Swiss-Prot record:
PROSITE patterns: RIBOSOMAL_S17
CDD domains: Ribosomal_uS17
Molecular function per GO: rRNA binding; structural constituent of ribosome
Gene responsible for this protein: rpsQ
Similarity remark: Belongs to the universal ribosomal protein uS17 family.
Keyword Nucleotidyltransferase recorded: no
Protein name (record): Small ribosomal subunit protein uS17
Any single Gene Ontology cellular-component annotation: cytosolic small ribosomal subunit
GO biological process terms on file: translation
Complexes and interactors: Part of the 30S ribosomal subunit.
Length: 91
Protein backbone atom coordinates (compact mmCIF):
# COMPACT_ATOMS: atom_id res chain seq x y z
CA UNK A 1 0.00 0.00 0.00
CA UNK A 2 1.26 3.46 -0.83
CA UNK A 3 0.32 6.86 0.50
CA UNK A 4 -1.37 9.32 -1.82
CA UNK A 5 1.37 11.33 -3.50
CA UNK A 6 -0.50 14.62 -3.57
CA UNK A 7 -3.54 14.56 -1.30
CA UNK A 8 -6.08 17.30 -1.93
CA UNK A 9 -6.01 20.15 0.56
CA UNK A 10 -8.62 22.82 1.22
CA UNK A 11 -8.88 25.95 3.35
CA UNK A 12 -12.09 26.74 5.19
CA UNK A 13 -13.80 27.98 8.34
CA UNK A 14 -14.71 25.80 11.33
CA UNK A 15 -18.48 25.91 11.83
CA UNK A 16 -18.82 23.16 14.47
CA UNK A 17 -16.56 21.51 17.01
CA UNK A 18 -19.14 19.81 19.25
CA UNK A 19 -17.95 16.27 18.49
CA UNK A 20 -14.92 14.69 20.15
CA UNK A 21 -11.87 14.81 17.84
CA UNK A 22 -14.00 16.02 14.92
CA UNK A 23 -14.76 19.36 13.29
CA UNK A 24 -17.01 20.55 10.49
CA UNK A 25 -15.30 22.87 8.02
CA UNK A 26 -17.19 25.09 5.58
CA UNK A 27 -15.23 25.57 2.34
CA UNK A 28 -16.31 28.35 -0.02
CA UNK A 29 -15.41 28.55 -3.69
CA UNK A 30 -16.32 30.89 -6.52
CA UNK A 31 -17.66 29.58 -9.81
CA UNK A 32 -18.61 31.44 -12.95
CA UNK A 33 -22.15 31.02 -14.25
CA UNK A 34 -21.90 29.35 -17.66
CA UNK A 35 -24.39 31.66 -19.40
CA UNK A 36 -24.35 34.95 -17.49
CA UNK A 37 -20.64 34.92 -16.53
CA UNK A 38 -21.40 36.20 -13.03
CA UNK A 39 -19.28 34.77 -10.21
CA UNK A 40 -21.32 32.88 -7.62
CA UNK A 41 -20.22 31.67 -4.19
CA UNK A 42 -20.76 27.98 -3.51
CA UNK A 43 -20.00 26.29 -0.21
CA UNK A 44 -19.69 22.74 1.04
CA UNK A 45 -19.17 21.28 4.51
CA UNK A 46 -16.51 18.67 5.21
CA UNK A 47 -16.12 16.58 8.36
CA UNK A 48 -12.47 16.46 9.42
CA UNK A 49 -10.43 14.70 12.11
CA UNK A 50 -9.02 16.98 14.83
CA UNK A 51 -6.94 14.59 16.94
CA UNK A 52 -6.02 17.10 19.67
CA UNK A 53 -9.31 19.08 19.82
CA UNK A 54 -7.47 22.36 19.18
CA UNK A 55 -9.98 24.01 16.83
CA UNK A 56 -12.65 26.50 17.83
CA UNK A 57 -15.61 27.86 15.90
CA UNK A 58 -14.51 30.60 13.50
CA UNK A 59 -10.94 29.36 13.03
CA UNK A 60 -9.50 29.35 9.51
CA UNK A 61 -7.99 25.89 8.98
CA UNK A 62 -6.26 23.82 6.32
CA UNK A 63 -7.53 20.25 5.86
CA UNK A 64 -6.13 17.40 3.80
CA UNK A 65 -7.76 14.34 2.29
CA UNK A 66 -6.92 11.00 3.91
CA UNK A 67 -8.27 7.47 4.19
CA UNK A 68 -11.86 7.15 5.48
CA UNK A 69 -11.81 7.46 9.27
CA UNK A 70 -15.56 6.99 9.75
CA UNK A 71 -18.77 7.05 7.73
CA UNK A 72 -18.48 10.78 7.03
CA UNK A 73 -14.86 11.69 7.88
CA UNK A 74 -12.19 11.35 5.21
CA UNK A 75 -10.30 14.60 5.85
CA UNK A 76 -7.81 15.50 8.57
CA UNK A 77 -6.70 18.79 10.09
CA UNK A 78 -3.29 19.97 8.87
CA UNK A 79 -2.96 23.35 10.57
CA UNK A 80 -4.83 26.29 12.04
CA UNK A 81 -4.08 29.29 9.83
CA UNK A 82 -5.92 31.95 11.86
CA UNK A 83 -7.85 31.85 15.08
CA UNK A 84 -11.46 33.01 15.07
CA UNK A 85 -12.78 35.85 17.18
CA UNK A 86 -15.24 34.82 19.87
CA UNK A 87 -18.19 37.23 19.78
CA UNK A 88 -19.34 38.72 23.06
CA UNK A 89 -15.92 38.40 24.70
CA UNK A 90 -15.09 41.96 25.74
CA UNK A 91 -12.43 41.35 28.37
Amino acid sequence: MTEAKNPRSLVGTVVSNLMDKSIVVNVERRIQHPLYKKYIRRSKKFHAHDAENICHIGDIVKIEECRPLSKTKSWRLVSVLAEGVIEGDNA
